[in-house]
Amino acid sequence: MATFEHTTVLLHEAIAALNVRPDGIYVDCTLGGGGHSREILQQLGLEGHLYSFDQDQTAIDYNQSNLATYLERGQVTFIKSNFANLKTELNARGLDHVDGVVYDLGVSSPQFDDAARGFSYQHDAPLDMRMDQSQKLTAQTVVNTWPYADLVRIFYRYGEEKFSKQVARLIERERAVQPIVTTGQLVEIIKNAIPARARRTGGHPAKRVFQAIRIAVNNELGVLETSLEQAIDLINVHGRVSVITFQSLEDRLVKTIFKEHSDLPELPPGLPVIPAEMQPDYRLVSRKPVVPSDAEIEANRRARSAKLRAIERLKITNK
């Protein structure tokens, strides 16, 4: 069985933002190493329940043992599914509303550290990058078959890579000679495509391209938008959705969705008092994102880009 040597980022802050009630029904959309699930379960009474999602069977298997005490008490249910299926999976279990939903986005440390999964530019491994090992699309397929224009688009849009065209052009040339099947091959191509001066700044030169391919393979932004809209609709009054992001694209998406739901509607000019029915159904738990402390960043470098945002439901309006 795989082990999860995983330090959960913003653990206490993310669960504090949920305002857990002992008898509440909660959802952890990203089970991973079980850090957030355990924190919620420790605050639940026997009448409360947690539903934990993960599309990675390795995470489910690990937590069968890791959270065995709570499983035996019947306090937690594991759901092997993409969190884009949040509403469908919960409805199938007789749930129309829950009291809180937490997301810890990005790839878990065990997935990064398992060279065979192909997520990391630090290890030579088959180009894979699938979070759900049963899906067909892999990084190898993207790199070897997607047209030049599509590669440029994902490198720029998902990786914010300034040298997207140069990297895509060299990939196109190299794959015509032989298939690109390992992370090591891809790293060398990226290094050769990016000018030497640019390689010396901004961290590892392959970081942005690897991020872009991972997002494309797993449709991360699409499934996040779908799932977040479902979570916001599912929470009860005073229920909350708490989200930890690790890169700017995800954070901007979360910020935008939360803003859309918590902003006042367009009001007639000169309206002296905003009537109750025009007040938003949701509010931001804090106006600015919560970020890790210096001490947490020093202890865990992967925490440095983390941001936490949360939203609370104030009322349910029949639309």
From Swiss-Prot:
GO terms for biological process: rRNA base methylation. The gene is rsmH. It catalyses: cytidine(1402) in 16S rRNA + S-adenosyl-L-methionine = N(4)-methylcytidine(1402) in 16S rRNA + S-adenosyl-L-homocysteine + H(+). InterPro entries: RsmH (IPR002903), SAM-dep_MeTrfase_MraW_recog (IPR023397), SAM-dependent_MTases_sf (IPR029063). The keyword Nucleotidyltransferase does not apply. Its EC number is 2.1.1.199. It is found in: Cytoplasm. This is Ribosomal RNA small subunit methyltransferase H. GO terms for cellular component: cytoplasm. S-adenosyl-L-methionine binds at residues 34-36, 54, 83, 104, 111. Its main location: cytoplasm. Specifically methylates the N4 position of cytidine in position 1402 (C1402) of 16S rRNA. It comes from the Bacteria. It comes from Lactiplantibacillus plantarum (strain ATCC BAA-793 / NCIMB 8826 / WCFS1) (Lactobacillus plantarum). Pfam families: Methyltransf_5. Gene3D superfamilies: Putative methyltransferase TM0872, insert domain (1.10.150.170), Vaccinia Virus protein VP39 (3.40.50.150). GO terms for molecular function: rRNA (cytosine-N4-)-methyltransferase activity. Disulfide bonds: none annotated. Belongs to the methyltransferase superfamily. RsmH family. Keywords: Cytoplasm, Methyltransferase, rRNA processing, S-adenosyl-L-methionine, Transferase.
